[in-house]
C-alpha cells in the first residue's frame, strides 16, 4: 500500500504537463501617483486565455509602492508569465500597451535604473523559457481586461504613461 503523504508530495513537486495550443496573455501595470510625481502605490493585472479564447486565470494584485509605472508594467509581465508557466503553457502570445516594455524585452535599449534592468532581465529569462513566444504592443483600447484588473486593485484610478 502506498503512502498518501508521499504521493501528495510527489504531485506537488511535479512539473505541469505542457498544454497544447496557443495561449494569449494580456498584462498591464498601474500606479497611483500624486501630481508631479512618477511613483506611488501600484498594481498589476494579467489575463491568460486558451486557444478557444476561454479564460484560464486572471490576476488583479497590489504590488506595493514603485518608483514609476514602467516598474509596474515589468512586474505585470513577470507575474503573467509565471501564471502561464504554472498552467504548463509552452506557446504564448503576450500583449501589452507599454511600448517601453516591448522594446525593453525585444531590443537592447538603455533603461534608467538598476531596478528596471533587473526586472527586464528577469522578464526576458521567463519569456525566453517558452517554446514559442511573441510579445506585441497593442493600443490601450485592446488591453482593457488587464487594465481594468490592474485598476481594480488600486484605491483610486491609476495614472497612465
List each language-model region with its residue ranges:
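Intrinsically disordered, low-complexity regions
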Residues: 1-24, 57-59, 87, 129, ...
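Active-site phosphate/pyrophosphate-handling residues
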Residues: 75
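RNase H-like nuclease fold core
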Residues: 12-71, 82-86
Amino acid at each position: 500500500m502506498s503512502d498518501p503523504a508521499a504521493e501528495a508530495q510527489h504531485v506537488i513537486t511535479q512539473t505541469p504537463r505542457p498544454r497544447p495550443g496557443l495561449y494569449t496573455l494580456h498584462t498591464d501595470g498601474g500606479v497611483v501617483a500624486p501630481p508631479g510625481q512618477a511613483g506611488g502605490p501600484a498594481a498589476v493585472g494579467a489575463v491568460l486565455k486558451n486557444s478557444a479564447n476561454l479564460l484560464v486565470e486572471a490576476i488583479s494584485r497590489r504590488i506595493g509602492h514603485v518608483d514609476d509605472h514602467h516598474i509596474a508594467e515589468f512586474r505585470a509581465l513577470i507575474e503573467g508569465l509565471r501564471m502561464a508557466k504554472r498552467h504548463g503553457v509552452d506557446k504564448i502570445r503576450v500583449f501589452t500597451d507599454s511600448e517601453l516594455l516591448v522594446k525593453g524585452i525585444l531590443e537592447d535599449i538603455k533603461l534608467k535604473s538598476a531596478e528596471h534592468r533587473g526586472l527586464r532581465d528577469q522578464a526576458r529569462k521567463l519569456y525566453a523559457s517558452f517554446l514559442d513566444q511573441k510579445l506585441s504592443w497593442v493600443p490601450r483600447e485592446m488591453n482593457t481586461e488587464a487594465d481594468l484588473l490592474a485598476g481594480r486593485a488600486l484605491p483610486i484610478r491609476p495614472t497612465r504613461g
